[in-house]
């Protein structure tokens, strides 16, 4: 004989089972959320990092903006940046468009605003032309460092200092858009003869061409008349004659050092270049 369970009992059991399942589901979900939150918190802590135990020597609170020249990009500072950072400085290496002087100046001004003052500007090669203009009347900038760089006076252009007729045949290549770059086969010997050959080949491959119209663009009022300056002469430079560099150093009344370096001094002599920049952070007011 079959026993029948009353319908009301079945309904009550159904409610109990349903409630149990819901509670179990919520419990699992809550546990998952807690674990996920804990994982997120751990990830956040890892991304923020624990306070570094490394002792820094930055007592000046001076930030640094590095400005490359033509035929290179911001990666040319890759050996200098860690030295400056390890000394406790905030560092930005810009990527110049190299389409016009105005665009390049604007790029550096944005970097100054981003990093905040006080700031030391460092220019290599054409980068010196740019910082001369970008720092003018900018109260955040406290000093200028020129590395084998152009330091023009008002009204001067790159064409005042570069004589294309004296360059080796085939040295420069101009593309259909009017952008200039160095023949990769001649890059190392003309620009970076003291750089490891393998690295020089990489530099040639990633070189950044510039709009040839930049050669004729004139400098505005120079910031080096307003600020303390430092200059590094590359004694073995084949891109800018060392005598021209010495002329610039004298013109801007710079604290000057000379290195037995190619034009690519930030790459071949990063320690000496970094030390000059660090000296500037201490000497600028």
Where are these regions (language model features)?
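Bacterial N-terminal signal peptides
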Residues: 16-29
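Conserved HGGG/HGGXW glycine-rich cap/lid loop of the alpha/beta-hydrolase fold
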Residues: 60-101, 119
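Active-site loop/oxyanion-hole signature of alpha/beta-hydrolase fold enzymes
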Residues: 90-120, 133-136, 159-163
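Gly/Ala-rich beta-loop-alpha elbow adjacent to hydrolase catalytic centers
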Residues: 122-127, 131
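Flexible "cap/lid" loop of the alpha/beta hydrolase fold
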Residues: 140-141, 145-184, 211-214, 248
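Active-site nucleophile elbow and catalytic-triad environment of alpha/beta-hydrolase enzymes
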Residues: 202-223
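Short beta-strand/loop motif that positions the catalytic acidic residue
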Residues: 231-233
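Conserved loop-alpha-helix segment in the C-terminal half of the alpha/beta-hydrolase fold
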Residues: 235-267, 280
């Amino acid at each position: 004989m079959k026993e029948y369970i009353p319908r009301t009992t079945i309904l009550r059991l159904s409610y109990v089972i349903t409630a149990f399942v819901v509670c179990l589901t919520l419990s699992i979900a809550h546990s998952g959320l807690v674990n996920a939150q804990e994982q997120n918190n751990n990830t956040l802590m890892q991304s923020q990092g624990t306070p570094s135990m490394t002792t820094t020597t930055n007592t000046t609170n001076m930030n640094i903006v590095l400005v490359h020249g033509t035929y290179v990009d911001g990666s040319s500072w890759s050996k200098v940046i860690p030295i400056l950072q390890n000394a406790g400085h905030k560092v930005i290496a810009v990527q110049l468009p190299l389409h016009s002087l105005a665009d390049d100046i604007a790029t550096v001004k944005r970097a100054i605003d981003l990093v905040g003052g006080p700031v030391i500007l460092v220019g290599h090669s054409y980068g010196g032309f740019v910082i001369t203009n970008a720092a003018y009347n900018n109260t955040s900038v406290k000093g200028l460092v020129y590395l084998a760089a152009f330091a023009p006076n008002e009204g001067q252009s790159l064409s005042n200092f570069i004589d294309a007729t004296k360059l080796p045949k085939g040295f420069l290549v101009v593309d259909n858009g009017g952008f200039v770059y160095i023949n990769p086969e001649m890059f190392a010997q003309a620009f970076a003869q003291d750089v490891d050959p393998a690295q020089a080949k990489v530099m040639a491959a990633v070189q950044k061409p510039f709009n040839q119209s930049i050669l004729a663009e004139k400098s505005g009022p120079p910031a080096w008349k307003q600020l303390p300056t430092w200059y590094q002469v590359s004694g073995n430079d084949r891109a800018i004659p060392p005598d021209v560099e010495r002329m610039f150093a004298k013109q801007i009344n710079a604290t000057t050092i000379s290195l037995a370096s190619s034009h690519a001094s930030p790459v071949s002599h990063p320690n000496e270049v970094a030390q000059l920049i660090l000296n500037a952070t201490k000497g600028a007011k």
